UniProtKB/Swiss-Prot annotation:
Family per similarity comment: Belongs to the GcvH family.
Xref: Pfam families: GCV_H (PF01597)
GO CC term (a single one): cytosol
Record's function text: The glycine cleavage system catalyzes the degradation of glycine. The H protein shuttles the methylamine group of glycine from the P protein to the T protein.
Top-rank taxon: Bacteria
Names of the cofactor(s): (R)-lipoate
UniProt xrefs under PANTHER family: GLYCINE CLEAVAGE SYSTEM H PROTEIN (PTHR11715), GLYCINE CLEAVAGE SYSTEM H PROTEIN-RELATED (PTHR11715:SF3)
Protein's GO biological process: glycine decarboxylation via glycine cleavage system
Protein name: Glycine cleavage system H protein
Alphabetical UniProt keywords: Lipoyl
Cofactor binding comment, as recorded: Binds 1 lipoyl cofactor covalently.
InterPro entries membership: 2-oxoA_DH_lipoyl-BS, Biotin_lipoyl, GCV_H, GCV_H/Fam206, GCV_H_sub, Single_hybrid_motif
C-alpha cells in the first residue's frame, strides 16, 4: 500500500499527526498506523472540554488485531471531538487524514510544531527504502 504523507502535517513518534490551523491543533492518526491496525471496530475519545497534558492518553482505537491508545503531542484543552469517527469507526480507516481526524486541541502554551517530525522524516521512519 502507498501511504499519503501531506507536507502540511507533522508527526509524533507514536504516529499521531498534527495540523496547525489558526492557533488550534487538529490531531489524528497516520495512515500507516491505521493500516497496521487493520479493521477498526471501536473508537473512544476524551470529552470535549478535557484538559490534558502532553503524553496523556486522549483516546483508544480498537481493531480486530489490537487495542491502541492515542497520545497528545502537546498539552491543552480539547475544544472539539470528531463524534463522526466515534459513531462510524470505519471513517478512521477510510480517511484518517481527512474525515477521520480525532480531536482539535487548544494548546496550553505556544507550541513548536518543529518539535515533531516533518512528513518526510516520518515517512523515512515508517517506510523502508
Amino acid at each position: 500500500m502507498s501511504y499519503k504523507f501531506p507536507d502540511n502535517l507533522n508527526y509524533a513518534d507514536t504516529h499521531e499527526y498534527v495540523l496547525e490551523e489558526k492557533g488550534l491543533l487538529k490531531i489524528g492518526v497516520s495512515e500507516f498506523a491505521i493500516d497496521q491496525l487493520g479493521d477498526i471496530v471501536f473508537v473512544e475519545l476524551a470529552d470535549q472540554g478535557s484538559t490534558l497534558e502532553k503524553g496523556e492518553t486522549f483516546g483508544t482505537i480498537e481493531s480486530v488485531k489490537a487495542v491502541e491508545e492515542v497520545y497528545l503531542p502537546f498539552s491543552g484543552e480539547i475544544v472539539s471531538v470528531n463524534e463522526n469517527v466515534v459513531d462510524n469507526p470505519e471513517l478512521l480507516q477510510n480517511d484518517p487524514i481527512g474525515e477521520g481526524w480525532l480531536v482539535i486541541l487548544k494548546p496550553k502554551t505556544k507550541v513548536s510544531i518543529s518539535d515533531l517530525m516533518t512528513s518526510e522524516e516520518y515517512q523515512s521512519k515508517v517506510v523502508p527504502k
